[in-house]
UniProtKB/Swiss-Prot annotation:
The keyword Ribosomal protein applies. GO terms for molecular function: structural constituent of ribosome. The keyword Ribonucleoprotein applies. PANTHER family: MITOCHONDRIAL 28S RIBOSOMAL PROTEIN S21, SMALL RIBOSOMAL SUBUNIT PROTEIN BS21. It comes from Marinomonas sp. (strain MWYL1). This is Small ribosomal subunit protein bS21. It holds the Pfam family Ribosomal_S21. GO terms for cellular component: ribonucleoprotein complex; ribosome. GO terms for biological process: translation. NCBIfam families: S21p (TIGR00030).
Amino acid sequence: MPAVKVKDNEPFDIALRRFKRSCEKAGVLAEVRRRECYEKPTTLRKRAAAAAVKRHAKKVSREQKKFQRLY
């Protein structure tokens, strides 16, 4: 859990903004959303496989664009 120490004479808004930023960096909200409800192991595997396919397609697309002739 991220913690923020409020400095002397620091406005609450700025401290809250720093706390939100530290929570975002730590990935707290993403983790909460992921654990919000139970997801079956088969669904997790399907999601991981779909992400791998998407990453591969993106990589191939970038490689095709790199070797594309520009004439």
